[in-house]
C-alpha cells in the first residue's frame, strides 16, 4: 500500500495544486518523498482490539483507511450487475501535527470510487475531497464525500443506505442483515512476513435491495453485498508490488463465505497469503499463510491508460486456483475480464464466480499490475 499511497499523494498534488493550505502542508511533509518504505502514522496495536460503534469511524492515527462495499446484483429482467462503492482516507500529516483551523484542512485527504459493471461493460468514476466535503461519523454512522454516501438509516449500524450517481450511472441500495466478522486475530490481520498488519473487519452477507441506473436505464435489483473496513499505517513491504484479494459468498447460504488475499513480491510471485472461512452465523476460522496457496490459470492482456500515464499493455490474471486448508481446490474466474478501474490509480475490481471446493460468487481486487 505504500506504493499506492505515494501514487495517490502525487495525484493529489496535481488535483489540489490551486488549493491552500493543502499544497503548503504537502510540500512541508518531506517524509512522503523518501520512498515507498515510508510508514504513515502509527502501526496498529495488536492488543488494542476492536470496539463498536467507535471503530465504524475514522482512525487518524493510521495513515490509510477505507470503507468498501461490493455487490452482486440481479435485476427483475434477469440481467446481472456489479457495484463497488469506496471511500478512502489518506493521512498526509503522518505526525498528526496539522494546526490549520480551516474546516477545509485536517491533515487528511479523501477520495471515493464508484464503479458499476455488466458482463461486458465496466464504468468507474472517482471524486476527490477535502475535509469540508466529507463527513465520517461512527454513530449514527455516515461515510460521505459530497453526495456519494454510505450511511445508517437509523441509530443502529444496519441497515445501510448506499448512494452514488455519476453521468448515466447510479446506485441506490439498502444493505441489511449480516453479522460483523473479524479477520485474523480478532481483527488484527497480518499482511507480510515482515509483520505489516491492519485492523480488518467485514459485514460479509449483506442483503442488497434497491435500484441502479446503467447507461441511462433504471433497474430494480436485489442481491448480495460485502462491506470491508480496514485501516493501517502500511499494508505491505516496499519490496512487494500489490495483492490479489477475493471475497466469496457461497451459492448455498448455509456454507457461508470465504475471504482470501495473497500479497505479491517484486517478481509478481505470491509471497504471503491468508484467508478466513466464515460460517453463515458469522463464526470465523482464520487460515494462516502455510495453509493458503494461489495459482494463476489464465491471464488477459489489456491496454491501460489514464490521464497520468501513457498507454501500456498489462497482463491481468482472470482465472485462478485457490487452495485453502479444509477445502478441495477452488477455481475462481472473472465474470468480466476487463474490470479495470482506469482512474488516477488504476486497478482491477470486478465480479467473480467460483467452482470446485467452494461454489459461489463474489469480487476480486487486483492491485499493482
What are the functions of these language-model segments?
Residues 1-8:
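Bacterial N-terminal signal peptides that target proteins for export
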Residues 8-9, 262:
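Short stretches within intrinsically disordered, low-complexity N-terminal or propeptide regions
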Residues 15-18:
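C-terminal motif of bacterial Sec signal peptides marking the signal peptidase cleavage site
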Residues 20-369:
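Structured soluble/peripheral alpha/beta segments that form catalytic or ligand/cofactor-binding pockets
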